[in-house]
């Protein structure tokens, strides 16, 4: 029974530590808006939340949320969200998202995912279906399984064979001065 009591003590000590870490996370978050807690909240498949969901860390969402979801870490979705999502990174696989997605870093929309809303990020890989505009200040990769109904603004775009896009693609964030390249009259006068 000594081993069982050791396990209990370790679990109990872990809980105390977790509470201390949570208090520390709240303090750090108040002092630094960029702080990301080293924890992941899990919303299980059978759980449904009506209302906004906020986390200082990451969220793994297998259930459903009717409300806005905000987390400072990575938001991984295999369930459904009806509302906007803001995260450091956003990953969705076999998910349903009805609302805008905003990420400071990468957005990955996996095959089997349907998004009805705009996407804003630093980079994006799209393998699912998106009905909305995609605004990415870095690279965008459109996989062969992707279906997009909306405009894409990015620094660069890679469209794999088989992808379906109904919209415009613009590399408006690229480091290319289009006017100087196509200024034929100005080049002749020099």
Sequence positions of predicted segments:
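C-terminal segments of enzyme domains that contribute to small-molecule binding surfaces
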Residues: 166-190
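Intrinsic disorder/low-complexity segments enriched in polar/small residues
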Residues: 4, 24-25, 188-189
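Detector for repetitive beta-architecture
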Residues: 40, 46, 50-52, 56-58, ...
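N-terminal domain-start segments of secreted/luminal proteins
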Residues: 18-47, 53
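Intrinsically disordered, low-complexity glycine/proline-rich and charged
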Residues: 5, 14, 156, 160-175
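Short, small-residue-biased leader/transition segments that mark boundaries at the very start
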Residues: 1-8
